[in-house]
Amino acid sequence: MEYITTIGLEVHVQLKTQSKMFCACPVEYGAQPNANTCPTCLGLPGALPVLNRGAIEYTVLAGMMLGCETPPVSKWDRKNYFYPDMPKNYQISQFDLPLCMGGHVPLYDHCYPKDAQKDITRSGQSIGLTRIHLEEDVAKSTHAAAGTTIDFNRAGTPLMEIVSEPDIESPEEAFAYLNSLRQILIYGELSDADMEKGQMRCDVNVSVRPPGQEELGVKIELKNMNSVSAVRRALHYEIERQVAVLKNGGELIQSTRRWDDDLGETQQMRTKEDAHDYRYFPDPDLLPVRTAEIIEKMRPRVPELPHQKAARFVEDFGISEYDASVLSSDLD
Protein backbone atom coordinates (compact mmCIF):
# COMPACT_ATOMS: atom_id res chain seq x y z
CA MET A 1 0.00 0.00 0.00
CA GLU A 2 1.37 3.39 -1.04
CA TYR A 3 1.06 6.03 1.66
CA ILE A 4 0.25 9.67 0.83
CA THR A 5 2.92 12.18 1.82
CA THR A 6 2.13 15.76 2.85
CA ILE A 7 4.91 18.30 3.35
CA GLY A 8 4.94 21.93 4.47
CA LEU A 9 8.02 24.12 4.80
CA GLU A 10 8.88 27.02 7.10
CA VAL A 11 11.78 28.94 5.56
CA HIS A 12 13.67 31.50 7.65
CA VAL A 13 15.55 34.09 5.58
CA GLN A 14 18.04 36.64 6.92
CA LEU A 15 17.43 39.96 5.17
CA LYS A 16 20.27 42.02 3.67
CA THR A 17 19.95 44.96 6.03
CA GLN A 18 22.94 46.79 7.44
CA SER A 19 21.62 46.76 11.00
CA LYS A 20 19.57 44.48 13.22
CA MET A 21 15.79 44.38 13.50
CA PHE A 22 15.33 46.37 16.70
CA CYS A 23 18.70 48.07 17.32
CA ALA A 24 21.56 49.74 15.44
CA CYS A 25 24.08 46.89 15.79
CA PRO A 26 25.60 45.91 12.42
CA VAL A 27 24.74 42.66 10.66
CA GLU A 28 28.11 41.16 9.78
CA TYR A 29 28.84 37.52 8.98
CA GLY A 30 32.13 36.23 10.37
CA ALA A 31 32.73 38.99 12.94
CA GLN A 32 34.44 38.20 16.23
CA PRO A 33 31.99 36.45 18.58
CA ASN A 34 29.76 38.82 20.56
CA ALA A 35 31.34 41.90 18.95
CA ASN A 36 28.11 43.25 17.42
CA THR A 37 25.88 43.46 20.47
CA CYS A 38 24.18 46.08 22.63
CA PRO A 39 21.76 46.17 25.59
CA THR A 40 18.77 45.75 23.24
CA CYS A 41 19.87 42.59 21.43
CA LEU A 42 21.29 41.19 24.67
CA GLY A 43 17.91 41.63 26.35
CA LEU A 44 19.18 43.79 29.21
CA PRO A 45 16.57 45.40 31.49
CA GLY A 46 15.31 48.78 30.35
CA ALA A 47 16.47 48.50 26.72
CA LEU A 48 13.68 49.30 24.26
CA PRO A 49 13.35 48.12 20.63
CA VAL A 50 13.26 50.49 17.65
CA LEU A 51 11.88 49.16 14.34
CA ASN A 52 14.15 48.71 11.32
CA ARG A 53 12.05 50.18 8.51
CA GLY A 54 14.28 48.68 5.83
CA ALA A 55 13.50 45.15 7.02
CA ILE A 56 9.77 45.90 6.84
CA GLU A 57 10.16 47.25 3.30
CA TYR A 58 12.10 44.17 2.20
CA THR A 59 9.42 41.88 3.59
CA VAL A 60 6.65 43.78 1.81
CA LEU A 61 8.68 43.59 -1.42
CA ALA A 62 9.08 39.83 -0.96
CA GLY A 63 5.31 39.59 -0.57
CA MET A 64 4.76 41.49 -3.81
CA MET A 65 7.17 39.22 -5.68
CA LEU A 66 5.39 36.14 -4.36
CA GLY A 67 1.84 37.36 -5.01
CA CYS A 68 0.90 37.94 -1.37
CA GLU A 69 -1.64 40.36 0.06
CA THR A 70 -0.36 42.94 2.54
CA PRO A 71 -2.97 43.97 5.13
CA PRO A 72 -3.33 47.68 5.93
CA VAL A 73 -2.06 47.15 9.48
CA SER A 74 0.49 44.71 10.87
CA LYS A 75 1.50 44.29 14.49
CA TRP A 76 4.21 42.74 16.68
CA ASP A 77 3.85 39.98 19.24
CA ARG A 78 5.96 38.31 21.89
CA LYS A 79 6.57 34.59 21.48
CA ASN A 80 7.39 33.39 24.97
CA TYR A 81 9.81 30.55 25.60
CA PHE A 82 13.05 29.90 27.44
CA TYR A 83 16.19 28.84 25.61
CA PRO A 84 19.81 29.96 26.06
CA ASP A 85 20.00 31.57 22.61
CA MET A 86 17.03 33.87 23.37
CA PRO A 87 18.28 36.41 25.96
CA LYS A 88 14.93 38.13 26.63
CA ASN A 89 13.14 34.79 27.14
CA TYR A 90 10.76 35.91 24.40
CA GLN A 91 11.13 36.55 20.69
CA ILE A 92 9.60 39.56 18.99
CA SER A 93 7.63 38.06 16.12
CA GLN A 94 4.19 38.33 14.46
CA PHE A 95 1.18 36.16 15.21
CA ASP A 96 -2.28 37.13 13.96
CA LEU A 97 -1.44 40.20 11.82
CA PRO A 98 1.65 39.37 9.74
CA LEU A 99 3.00 41.61 6.99
CA CYS A 100 1.98 39.27 4.14
CA MET A 101 -0.79 36.71 3.62
CA GLY A 102 -1.29 34.12 0.89
CA GLY A 103 0.86 34.03 -2.22
CA HIS A 104 2.63 31.20 -4.03
CA VAL A 105 6.03 29.90 -5.16
CA PRO A 106 6.19 28.55 -8.74
CA LEU A 107 7.91 25.20 -9.32
CA TYR A 108 10.34 25.62 -12.22
CA ASP A 109 11.40 22.38 -13.93
CA HIS A 110 15.10 23.26 -13.77
CA CYS A 111 14.83 23.63 -9.97
CA TYR A 112 14.19 19.91 -9.51
CA PRO A 113 17.13 17.55 -8.85
CA LYS A 114 18.89 16.52 -12.06
CA ASP A 115 18.27 12.85 -11.30
CA ALA A 116 14.53 13.49 -10.95
CA GLN A 117 13.83 15.48 -14.13
CA LYS A 118 12.09 12.54 -15.81
CA ASP A 119 9.79 12.05 -12.82
CA ILE A 120 8.32 15.57 -12.66
CA THR A 121 4.56 15.13 -12.33
CA ARG A 122 3.39 18.68 -11.59
CA SER A 123 5.28 20.75 -14.15
CA GLY A 124 4.33 24.43 -14.07
CA GLN A 125 2.49 24.15 -10.76
CA SER A 126 2.85 26.43 -7.74
CA ILE A 127 3.02 25.82 -4.00
CA GLY A 128 0.71 28.02 -1.95
CA LEU A 129 1.92 30.22 0.88
CA THR A 130 0.11 30.71 4.18
CA ARG A 131 1.93 33.86 5.28
CA ILE A 132 5.19 35.77 5.52
CA HIS A 133 6.05 37.40 8.82
CA LEU A 134 9.01 39.27 10.21
CA GLU A 135 10.82 38.53 13.44
CA GLU A 136 14.23 38.70 15.11
CA ASP A 137 16.77 35.91 14.82
CA VAL A 138 18.20 34.13 17.84
CA ALA A 139 21.85 33.80 18.85
CA LYS A 140 24.04 31.05 17.40
CA SER A 141 24.81 28.09 19.67
CA THR A 142 27.87 25.93 19.00
CA HIS A 143 27.91 22.54 20.68
CA ALA A 144 31.16 20.72 21.46
CA ALA A 145 32.32 18.00 23.82
CA ALA A 146 33.61 20.58 26.30
CA GLY A 147 30.32 22.49 26.36
CA THR A 148 28.18 24.95 24.43
CA THR A 149 29.16 28.49 23.44
CA ILE A 150 26.74 31.20 22.34
CA ASP A 151 27.50 34.03 19.90
CA PHE A 152 24.97 36.87 20.17
CA ASN A 153 26.11 38.60 16.96
CA ARG A 154 23.21 36.92 15.17
CA ALA A 155 20.63 37.76 17.87
CA GLY A 156 18.26 40.41 16.58
CA THR A 157 19.08 40.00 12.88
CA PRO A 158 15.96 40.62 10.74
CA LEU A 159 14.46 37.23 9.91
CA MET A 160 11.67 36.75 7.40
CA GLU A 161 9.70 33.53 7.87
CA ILE A 162 7.94 32.18 4.79
CA VAL A 163 5.35 29.53 5.64
CA SER A 164 4.04 27.26 2.89
CA GLU A 165 0.72 25.52 2.69
CA PRO A 166 0.92 21.71 3.07
CA ASP A 167 0.88 21.42 -0.73
CA ILE A 168 4.20 19.64 -1.30
CA GLU A 169 3.89 15.96 -2.18
CA SER A 170 7.46 14.65 -2.40
CA PRO A 171 11.07 15.35 -1.35
CA GLU A 172 11.78 16.34 -4.95
CA GLU A 173 9.05 18.99 -4.89
CA ALA A 174 10.47 20.32 -1.61
CA PHE A 175 13.88 20.52 -3.32
CA ALA A 176 12.38 22.44 -6.27
CA TYR A 177 10.39 24.75 -3.97
CA LEU A 178 13.49 25.77 -2.01
CA ASN A 179 15.57 26.34 -5.14
CA SER A 180 12.80 28.40 -6.74
CA LEU A 181 12.23 30.47 -3.60
CA ARG A 182 15.96 31.09 -3.19
CA GLN A 183 16.17 32.23 -6.81
CA ILE A 184 13.33 34.74 -6.32
CA LEU A 185 14.85 36.14 -3.11
CA ILE A 186 18.19 36.66 -4.85
CA TYR A 187 16.43 38.33 -7.82
CA GLY A 188 14.90 40.83 -5.43
CA GLU A 189 18.28 41.37 -3.72
CA LEU A 190 16.53 40.67 -0.42
CA SER A 191 19.00 38.06 0.82
CA ASP A 192 22.03 36.08 -0.31
CA ALA A 193 20.09 33.02 0.93
CA ASP A 194 23.27 31.01 1.58
CA MET A 195 22.19 28.00 3.63
CA GLU A 196 25.77 27.14 4.63
CA LYS A 197 26.06 30.58 6.28
CA GLY A 198 22.67 30.24 7.94
CA GLN A 199 21.16 33.01 5.80
CA MET A 200 18.38 30.65 4.74
CA ARG A 201 17.21 27.90 7.07
CA CYS A 202 14.38 25.46 6.69
CA ASP A 203 12.12 23.59 9.10
CA VAL A 204 10.14 20.76 7.53
CA ASN A 205 6.72 19.47 8.58
CA VAL A 206 5.94 16.04 7.13
CA SER A 207 3.20 13.48 7.63
CA VAL A 208 2.00 10.32 5.90
CA ARG A 209 -1.44 8.74 5.73
CA PRO A 210 -3.00 5.72 4.00
CA PRO A 211 -4.93 6.18 0.74
CA GLY A 212 -8.56 7.15 1.26
CA GLN A 213 -7.92 8.96 4.55
CA GLU A 214 -8.86 12.62 4.23
CA GLU A 215 -7.44 13.75 7.58
CA LEU A 216 -3.74 14.54 7.53
CA GLY A 217 -1.41 12.21 9.40
CA VAL A 218 0.57 13.06 12.54
CA LYS A 219 2.89 15.99 11.83
CA ILE A 220 6.60 15.54 12.51
CA GLU A 221 8.91 18.57 12.37
CA LEU A 222 12.48 18.20 11.09
CA LYS A 223 15.34 20.58 11.91
CA ASN A 224 19.10 20.94 11.37
CA MET A 225 19.33 20.75 7.57
CA ASN A 226 21.99 23.05 6.12
CA SER A 227 21.45 22.52 2.39
CA VAL A 228 18.64 21.91 -0.08
CA SER A 229 20.05 18.45 -0.75
CA ALA A 230 20.02 17.69 2.99
CA VAL A 231 16.32 18.58 3.11
CA ARG A 232 15.68 16.06 0.34
CA ARG A 233 17.72 13.35 2.07
CA ALA A 234 16.05 13.99 5.43
CA LEU A 235 12.59 13.76 3.89
CA HIS A 236 13.32 10.48 2.13
CA TYR A 237 14.53 8.97 5.41
CA GLU A 238 11.70 10.35 7.54
CA ILE A 239 8.94 9.30 5.14
CA GLU A 240 10.31 5.75 5.07
CA ARG A 241 10.57 5.77 8.88
CA GLN A 242 6.98 6.92 9.39
CA VAL A 243 5.60 4.43 6.88
CA ALA A 244 7.53 1.61 8.57
CA VAL A 245 6.13 2.57 11.99
CA LEU A 246 2.55 2.54 10.70
CA LYS A 247 2.96 -0.70 8.74
CA ASN A 248 4.28 -2.39 11.88
CA GLY A 249 1.22 -1.31 13.86
CA GLY A 250 2.99 1.48 15.74
CA GLU A 251 1.73 4.97 16.55
CA LEU A 252 3.33 8.27 15.52
CA ILE A 253 3.49 11.11 18.06
CA GLN A 254 3.68 14.78 17.08
CA SER A 255 7.28 15.71 17.75
CA THR A 256 10.40 17.52 16.59
CA ARG A 257 13.35 15.57 15.21
CA ARG A 258 16.82 16.64 14.08
CA TRP A 259 18.56 15.45 10.94
CA ASP A 260 22.04 13.94 11.37
CA ASP A 261 23.60 14.14 7.92
CA ASP A 262 26.62 12.04 8.93
CA LEU A 263 24.46 9.16 10.16
CA GLY A 264 21.78 9.72 7.53
CA GLU A 265 18.92 9.57 10.03
CA THR A 266 16.54 11.72 12.06
CA GLN A 267 16.70 11.68 15.86
CA GLN A 268 14.08 12.58 18.45
CA MET A 269 14.52 16.02 20.07
CA ARG A 270 11.25 16.77 21.88
CA THR A 271 7.50 16.50 21.63
CA LYS A 272 6.14 19.29 19.48
CA GLU A 273 4.69 22.45 21.01
CA ASP A 274 1.51 24.09 19.74
CA ALA A 275 1.04 27.83 19.22
CA HIS A 276 -0.82 28.23 22.53
CA ASP A 277 2.25 26.90 24.36
CA TYR A 278 4.11 30.09 23.41
CA ARG A 279 1.44 32.37 24.92
CA TYR A 280 1.65 35.01 22.22
CA PHE A 281 0.56 38.51 23.20
CA PRO A 282 1.03 41.96 21.59
CA ASP A 283 4.38 43.60 22.27
CA PRO A 284 3.64 46.69 24.38
CA ASP A 285 6.84 48.45 23.29
CA LEU A 286 6.11 48.50 19.54
CA LEU A 287 3.35 50.29 17.64
CA PRO A 288 1.51 48.55 14.79
CA VAL A 289 2.76 49.31 11.27
CA ARG A 290 0.54 50.93 8.64
CA THR A 291 1.59 49.52 5.29
CA ALA A 292 -0.06 51.69 2.58
CA GLU A 293 2.90 54.07 2.20
CA ILE A 294 5.40 51.19 2.23
CA ILE A 295 3.47 49.33 -0.48
CA GLU A 296 3.52 52.35 -2.79
CA LYS A 297 7.22 52.91 -2.15
CA MET A 298 8.17 49.31 -2.94
CA ARG A 299 5.88 48.77 -5.93
CA PRO A 300 8.35 50.24 -8.49
CA ARG A 301 11.09 48.02 -7.08
CA VAL A 302 9.42 44.73 -8.01
CA PRO A 303 11.89 43.19 -10.49
CA GLU A 304 11.29 41.03 -13.54
CA LEU A 305 10.89 37.57 -12.03
CA PRO A 306 12.59 34.40 -13.32
CA HIS A 307 9.47 33.01 -15.02
CA GLN A 308 8.82 36.40 -16.65
CA LYS A 309 12.38 36.59 -17.94
CA ALA A 310 12.14 33.02 -19.23
CA ALA A 311 8.92 33.83 -21.12
CA ARG A 312 10.62 36.87 -22.66
CA PHE A 313 13.60 34.76 -23.77
CA VAL A 314 11.25 32.25 -25.44
CA GLU A 315 9.39 35.01 -27.27
CA ASP A 316 12.41 37.13 -28.23
CA PHE A 317 14.93 34.41 -29.09
CA GLY A 318 12.80 31.38 -29.94
CA ILE A 319 14.59 29.05 -27.52
CA SER A 320 12.97 26.17 -25.65
CA GLU A 321 11.16 26.75 -22.37
CA TYR A 322 13.69 24.60 -20.51
CA ASP A 323 16.69 26.48 -21.93
CA ALA A 324 15.01 29.78 -21.13
CA SER A 325 14.36 28.71 -17.54
CA VAL A 326 18.01 27.67 -17.11
CA LEU A 327 19.26 30.99 -18.52
CA SER A 328 16.87 32.99 -16.35
CA SER A 329 17.93 31.14 -13.19
CA ASP A 330 20.92 33.48 -12.88
CA LEU A 331 20.25 37.11 -11.97
CA ASP A 332 23.12 38.24 -14.22
Model-derived segments and their meaning:
Residues 1-304, 315, 319-321:
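Basic, nucleic-acid-interacting segments
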Residues 307-308:
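A generic alpha-helix surface/boundary motif
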